[in-house]
Curated annotation (Swiss-Prot):
It comes from Rickettsia prowazekii (strain Madrid E). Transfers and isomerizes the ribose moiety from AdoMet to the 7-aminomethyl group of 7-deazaguanine (preQ1-tRNA) to give epoxyqueuosine (oQ-tRNA). Its main location: cytoplasm. It is found in: Cytoplasm. Belongs to the QueA family. GO terms for molecular function: S-adenosylmethionine:tRNA ribosyltransferase-isomerase activity. The keyword Cytoplasm applies. Its EC number is 2.4.99.17. SUPFAM superfamilies: QueA-like. One of its GO terms (biological process) is queuosine biosynthetic process. This is S-adenosylmethionine:tRNA ribosyltransferase-isomerase.
Length: 383
């Protein structure tokens, strides 16, 4: 199939810039011969006793760092505890060997890769990478969320030459400096002073996230509240968790007209023995398995061999296209996706090409909100 087959017209006004007032107050579209539009908190009515909801428990890290001079990097893939691949903007301003200081901690540019990508090495002073990012980083909101940046002292850089350093009377104790190959010095402050009126640190994170590693949220889970999870448990709906650390590559466009020529990025996955056993048991009993998000679906189907889900840690680059043989997942809860994206292609494979185009046409007519902070839809596997 051609990439253009998966195109549709999406009004920019439908791209959600902020989360709903409450997590479960977003809209939910139930796919079917007659679509049902309701509120997310009513999802309980569409699940049965004995069904299994599988969640991705990966936690978003504060992967966005300001390097001064209007340069930012977004960590993308962990190579080791101290080495990462990152997307830089603009990468042309960075050179191999550039050093960036945050208080007593240092980041070194070690390699320039494909367009926009770099390798960085962290040299941290008695602090873990996660604690470093918690102090100096920001939640990496997707590029399509375009709104005024929160007030952040790390954006207020003081630039000067080392040989002609300006004397500042009152510099906060947590100011830091950046040294680059062209001998510029930039002083930065950590993000302790962020004024975040939209509370992205909370709302761009699922309430059940546990394992740090994602640089983008598994957004289908953002709608769940403790109250909903408690009601599902009372009804007899079971839950299980897998881990897939979402990479920034999830936002990369498909650039080949022949979709089968597209190469997916790899992402780390993990399925515990307990989760594998409950998935297999549910399947054997003939009950429904509902994947909360495309990341969960991709993890489960990647780990399946002859209808049996295997436990373990692995990387997946699975690209699900029409004709894919789904062995495990019966239903998919997901947000609304980009036209011509790997995720829209995935849901067409799962729930039907014509059906998904019709569903999205209906969603657009109903002015449902799209993408990370948008509304959700519950899809049934086409058989």
């Amino acid at each position: 199939m051609k990439l253009s087959d998966f195109d549709f017209n999406l009004p920019s006004a439908l791209i959600a810039q902020y989360p709903s007032s409450e997590r479960d107050n977003s809209d939910l579209l139930i796919a079917g011969t007659k679509h049902i539009k309701t509120k997310f908190y009513n999802i309980i009515d569409y699940l049965k006793k004995g069904d299994l909801l599988v969640f991705n428990n990966s936690k978003v890290i504060k992967a966005k760092l300001h390097l001064g001079k209007n340069i930012t990097i977004n960590l993308n893939k962990k190579l080791s505890d101290n080495c990462w691949i990152a997307f830089a903007k603009p990468a042309r301003k960075l050179n191999i060997g550039d050093e960036f200081y945050f208080d007593t901690h240092k980041i070194i540019i070690t390699e320039k890769l494909a367009i926009g990508e770099i390798k960085v090495k962290f040299m941290l002073d008695n602090i873990s990478i996660i604690k470093f990012l918690d102090k100096y980083g920001e939640i990496p909101l997707p590029f399509y969320i375009k709104r005024p940046s929160p007030v952040c002292y790390s954006n207020m850089a003081l630039c000067c030459k080392p040989e002609n350093t300006l004397k500042i009377k009152s510099i906060p104790h947590n100011m830091s400096k950046i040294v680059t190959n062209n001998s510029n010095t930039v002083n930065l402050r950590s993000n302790d002073g962020i004024i975040d009126s939209t509370n992205d640190n909370d709302r761009y994170q699922t309430i059940y996230s546990q394992i740090e590693g994602s640089v983008a949220a598994p957004t289908a889970g953002l709608h769940f509240t403790k109250n909903i999870l408690d009601k599902l448990k009372t009804k007899g709906v079971h839950t299980a968790f897998v881990t897939l650390h979402v990479g920034a590559g999830t936002f990369l466009p498909v650039k080949t007209e022949n979709i089968h020529e597209h190469k997916m990025h790899t992402e780390y996955c993990s399925i515990t023995t307990e989760t594998a056993e409950i998935i297999n048991k549910t399947k054997q009993e003939g009950r429904s398995i509902i994947a909360v998000g495309t990341t969960t679906l991709r993890t489960i189907e990647s780990a399946c061999n002859n209808g049996i889900v295997r436990a373990g840690n692995f990387e997946t680059d699975i690209f699900i296209t029409p004709g894919f043989n789904f062995q495990v997942v019966d239903m998919l809860l997901t947000n609304f996706h980009f036209p011509k994206s790997t995720l829209f292609i995935l849901i067409c494979a799962f729930a039907g090409f014509k059906e998904m185009h019709a569903l999205y046409k209906y969603a657009i007519k109903e002015k449902m909100r799209f993408f990370s902070y948008g509304d959700a839809t519950l899809l049934y596997r086409k058989v």
